[in-house]
Amino acid sequence: MSDRLRQPGVLELDELVAEGVSPWLDGLTRGHLASGCLTRLIARTGVRGATSDPAALAAAVESDDAYREQLAGLASDDICAADAVRAVAAYDVRWACDELRPVYQATRGLDGLVSMDLDPRLAHDVESAVAEAEQTLRAVNRPNAMVKLPATTEGIAAIRECVGAGFPVHVTAVFSASRYREALDAYAEGLRRALADGRRLSRLVSVVSLPVGLLDAEVDARLEDLGTPDALALRGEAAVARARHFYRMYDDWFGGADWRAMAAAGAHPQRLMWTATTVTDPSSSLTRYVEQLVTWGTITLMTLPTLKAAARRLDMCGDTLMGRHGAALEVWRRLEDLGVDGEGIARKLEAESVEGLAAAWRDLYAAVDAGRHTAHRT
């Protein structure tokens, strides 16, 4: 995309959207809503969805006066901490769902979605996780809200149950092909259960995310430790290669005969989302992942700075994933030959993601609790 002046009515990310990529906002907070930022991103930039996360929400609750009035209303001792946290998170997601409702309607429910995390302490108990998903979605009370569930062993079971119960699910923390296969299986089994229970599959949506920046950072650190020319030449290659492999798996899965029967019943494919797209290497373009992960039917999640950089300029070169499966497998073969253990890295990153989510959730509880106490004293 050039730096030319844009014509009226042309979205800033029109070329990305034209390639079938849906740009979503990462780290949604009330500040994005109250300031009109999300409204402008939808109208001018072409943002088509958003995700909330507890780390961003905790920081916002601590620093943004926009939460003060609600926290004062939640200061009663009759409201437990879990209900207060859920209420704060649900308020933001509900507002964002309303802002994105026209996109949701225009895309027949495929975009215009907003996803939010569940308390990770429930992730090891499938029954509790499903109950929390139901409570959370009821609190938001919007058809375009989704719940996030990490693709741990227990999380996979919860994903299957939630989809079967008719809940829209955003599957997170998928780093390996084996785990992605489990997520696909869980989605398919959930759809079969939903269909057997008489649910309308056309209302069920799901996305599954690969945190590309986290994967590259871990692999590149190991390559730099090796320090050989062959190792250093592979820096920055791992995540895009894995994304290409995932897309081939996606294409095979949703192009098969079994899926065609589900599609005939109204089911939607579980879309791939690229997350952790913030580039911290000063020698790389801020939009590197946005430009390198382009293919039809996918989602790219971006923080506000990355969105702004992409809106200013993108060097697009068409589809970057389709038909590159062989080259992707070759990258990972070379990495394995160097001693880079892909499955081991995936397990490590999955564990760190779950631990990080738990820590962020503790911070969110503390921030909401402090805000309630401050409001109670004033």
Residue ranges and their predicted role:
Residues 22-24, 48-51, 111-115, 144-148, ...:
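Structural preference for beta-strand elements that scaffold enzyme active sites
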Residues 56-59, 63-158:
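Active-site beta->alpha loop and helix N-cap motifs at the rims of alpha/beta catalytic domains
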Residues 1-36:
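N- or domain-start disorder-to-order transition segments that initiate the globular core
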Residues 165-305:
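Catalytic alpha/beta core domains of metabolic enzymes, predominantly
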Residues 53, 116, 147, 162, ...:
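Conserved, mostly hydrophobic/aromatic
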Residues 32, 125-131, 149-163, 176-187:
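Active-site-adjacent beta->alpha loops and helix N-cap segments on the catalytic face
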Residues 26-30, 55, 117-123, 150-154, ...:
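Active-site beta-loop-alpha junctions enriched in small/polar residues
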Residues 266-376:
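Flexible, acidic glycine-rich loops studded with aromatic residues
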